[in-house]
Amino acid sequence: MSRIYGMAKMAYQAIRPFRERQMACRVCNYYKDSTDREVLEVLEYIKKNKTMKSFNYPFAEKYRHYRCPLRKDRKSGLFLTKYHGHQMYFSRDFFTSSACVNYMRSILTEQDPESPHRYLTDSFDVDEGSVVVDAGAAEGNFSLDILEKASKLILVECNRNWLEALVKTFAKEIAVGKVEIVPKLLGDHDDHSHVSIDFLYQKYGKIDFIKLDIEGGEENALRGGVKWMRECPAAKLAVCAYHKPDAFHYIWQMLENQNLFHLSYTKGYMYFPAVINDQPPYLRRGLIRAVRRQQVNRSYE
């Protein structure tokens, strides 16, 4: 396995610089007539560096050589690190230290205060005592960041390898009932592998904040949460809007049609590389933030 992994990694590393340069040229050509200042800022960075990354801004450079402290749990065999003062486990998919380090670099980059992927800000945050749904929990970094603020955390994650890691990361909180893990995909219906926002709302009686980062399933998840959106006066949402080319438009329209929310989006653009064939728009907004209008008594970014 390690030999196959090593060969695959070498092949990917060999082709990656070419692909990044190719995409840099394609993106610059696609946006050559743009007058959007934020687009022009990205293009300037791309032209200067002659490459295309997910985050084409100077802030990303400070994590390029970041090294996180790692150790291996003897009992489970999983790698773990310290994340903002908390122990955080990696899934079994990360079976080399270099893979763990690269993953941590990506987490820190996407949650940098200047990142288009940043979930929270000083003015858009989880309130003390909130019940929070972390959909697409993965390694659990979002939940760890708000662990002290939230009264309850509901982690929705369908990847079995991440489930094992999450149970280790949140063992103490699970034991006292502060954290519950739902091993399903958040969607617009309920069955053995899917769960809806409205089902969780009915089960727990209160949900104040939902983070949606579910690899393109955000629209379906919102369709399954109409009752919650209409009935919860404290509702807040942080919704990833870049996984599909048209995601931003549809998610914004869906939330706007509810006529309930103050909507905003994160500053800047990010590039989300497709597995097979990249489709425009190549530069996409990272997140849409939604706050029930009753709560808007101050400025949200």
Label each region the model flagged.
Residues D127, I146-K149, E173, Y204, ...:
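Short, conserved loop/helix-junction motifs that constitute active-site signature segments
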Residues G136, K211-E215:
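Conserved S-adenosyl-L-methionine
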Residues D145-K149, T169, A221-W228, Y250-M254:
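A short acidic, amphipathic alpha-helical/loop segment
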Residues G187, Y242-K244, G268:
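Active-site beta-loop-alpha junctions enriched in small/polar residues
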Residues I210, P233-Y242:
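Conserved beta-strand signature within the Rossmann-like core of class I S-adenosyl-L-methionine
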